[in-house]
Amino acid sequence: IRSDGGAYCFSTKGTVAKSAICGAGPYQIENVKVTATGYYTNNTPSGAMRTFGVLQPTFAIESLMDICSEKLGIDPIELRMINGMKDGAVTHTRQVLGKVAYTETLKKCSEIAGWEVGSSRVRGSVRKDIKGSQIAEPYIPGKEFKSEEAMKLCRDRFKYGRGVGTGWYGIGRC
């Protein structure tokens, strides 16, 4: 991960550190190395905004998961279920996790969202009023996320919408 810290690198150190910590996403990857470097440049000062360095690696790892699922001919949800961290998982920073609700959360979200098994090309009729069908999983180490409570809360407040966003704070947030 390379970060353009601008002329002063105000918050580059913290942003780059967080990018490295979140670089592998919520996936159990046996052989992974994440390198993150911040650079001084002649660009305007830049640094932490909203997710403090988490957005860039999250976008990269989730895009990679989509590319892999397409090349392997596997449903994107299925690939994430196979590789998602489970109870007792060890992160690439060697942190041992206790209870991990990733697969349960992903399964429940895909059920509520009406995600059907199979690639989008064979999934059946596609709604014309909504462009695309995506799912993303927020990965915030150290933050307690109770999937059961979140899904109970979201079920009645599920939203459909259109938009382009760079994080899960966007249009479908409960």
Where are these regions (language model features)?
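Alpha-helical support elements that line or immediately flank enzyme active sites
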Residues: 10-22, 50-78, 83, 104, ...
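Gly/Pro-rich active-site capping loops and adjacent beta-alpha segments
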Residues: 1-57, 138-147, 152-174
